[in-house]
Amino acid sequence: LAAVDCSEYPKPACTMEHRPLCGSDNQTYDNKCNFCNAVVESNGTLTLSHFGKC
């Protein structure tokens, strides 16, 4: 099972870094920062499906 440490999020701004990950919502996030911000907003219901595009 893939995991990402989101303990230092949310952050007010994310870089444009392109390292896609796929969330459990079947949405592709551009990078860890965007993904982790979404995880925080979802109150932890969003998880990582896998690294790379969905």
Swiss-Prot record:
Disulfide bonds join C6-C36, C14-C33, C22-C54. InterPro entries: Bifunctional_prot_inhibitor (IPR051597), Kazal_dom (IPR002350), Kazal_dom_sf (IPR036058), Prot_inh_Kazal-m (IPR001239). Glycans are attached at N43. GO terms for molecular function: serine-type endopeptidase inhibitor activity. The keyword Repeat applies. Keywords: Disulfide bond, Glycoprotein, Protease inhibitor, Repeat, Secreted, Serine protease inhibitor. Its main location: secreted. Residues 4-54 form the Kazal-like domain. It is found in: Secreted. Pfam families: Kazal_1. SMART domains: KAZAL. Avian ovomucoid consists of three homologous, tandem Kazal family inhibitory domains. This is Ovomucoid. It comes from Guttera pucherani.
